[in-house]
Amino acid sequence: MAMEKQLSDKIAFISYIIPMFADAYKMNTQEAWFYLKQYGGFDFINKHWWALHTDNVLYALNDIYEVCHKNGGRR
């Protein structure tokens, strides 16, 4: 049961953070999804979601942006 809860929490966080990222960086959700996939942001979210979801959303968004920027993203 704990694994199901953790998976549910992870899905909820990812579903929340991608539109927040889109709003913060003036993209629509689809553009944000492709941007995050292309520049490593989604892999970062997927791997570190547990830490990101406990952080202030502005810091989490900045961390995700920094990962993308280091991988060639220029938004």
Enumerate the language-model features and the residues they cover.
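Short amphipathic alpha-helical segments, especially helix-boundary/capping motifs
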Residues: 6-10, 37-42, 66
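Amphipathic, hydrophobic secondary-structure cores in small proteins
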Residues: 22-24, 28-55
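N-terminal acidic leader/helix
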Residues: 2-26
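Short hydrophobic/aromatic-rich motifs at helix boundaries and adjacent loops
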Residues: 1-5, 33-36
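Long, compositionally biased
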Residues: 50-75
